Amino acid sequence: NSVLPGPTRTDGVEKFIQDVFPGLTQAEAECRFIAENRPTSLIGRLIDPREIGDIVAFVCSARASVINGSCIRAEGGLVRTIC
């Protein structure tokens, strides 16, 4: 199994966004980044790393034993598909 995270709030992503939008607060820069670069995002924000961790923990647990060979998108609704 694999987890495919979308834009996640990490130190590197925060620095990148601040470099792209200098002079704005971190919150303002993140909002602008999402609005300009991820306008289709259903959650409209960066993903918290703990949210990705929760998914990974579940996929690694015995409760997910029937999930095999899956790619799990955790990207906040950027990709719109119906399986």
Language-model regions, residue ranges each:
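Short C-terminal tail/terminal secondary-structure segment
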Residues: 57, 68-83
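Residues within well-ordered alpha-helical secondary structure of globular protein domains
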Residues: 19, 58-61
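Conserved SDR Rossmann-fold cofactor-binding beta-strand/turn motif
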Residues: 1-9, 60, 73-75
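A glycine/serine/threonine-rich, flexible loop-to-helix segment
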Residues: 7-40, 81-83
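Conserved active-site helix of classical SDR/Rossmann-fold NAD(P)-dependent CH-OH oxidoreductases
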Residues: 1, 53-54, 79
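Short aromatic/basic micro-patch
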Residues: 7, 46, 66
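A conserved structural motif in NAD(P)-dependent oxidoreductases
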Residues: 25-26, 40-52, 63
